């Protein structure tokens, strides 16, 4: 079974202003079909963050993403996408999409990440996931219903398909408009991954205005 490659990000306190990023070095073109460039809903630029709850770099990256999201313009549609490489990751993906069906998703999402990395709760079973969400205020019957639902199964299946479509082999990764991929290997730092994302977003805005 394919194993995920964790990228060790280097922390950098110095940001390079207006850096010119280069395709093939800083980001990768993964699809040149123009029909896929723009999210069809409201014609927004789609940004996907591929992640896994057990990835320590994804956990740290969450704070960077949260601040970055607050600065985004209204033409951005941001999506978290859990990746699936084995049964444990599948379980965590089901947990993610279960939380998406609950009120206060962002709160549950943040607490789940925190519990995994700060409290060493690896969530290796459905029971451990359900018990945790219930301990955080979720209704047990609602959690169990959603966890085993066709909707959650479909969303996990779609995420698994996108894993291959986007050629994801490391996390975290950013996918922009189904067209560009930024991996940790290319970005090298958390800050730079978001700088490259901004650069590509500007490219997409300019291409749409032509």
Which ranges hold each PLM region?
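Alpha-helix N-cap/helix-start motif
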Residues: 58, 88-89, 122, 186, ...
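Extracytoplasmic/secreted envelope proteins and their assembly/folding machinery
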Residues: 62-69, 92-96, 109, 126, ...
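Structural microenvironment flanking redox-active thiols in thiol-disulfide oxidoreductases
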Residues: 71-101, 106-134
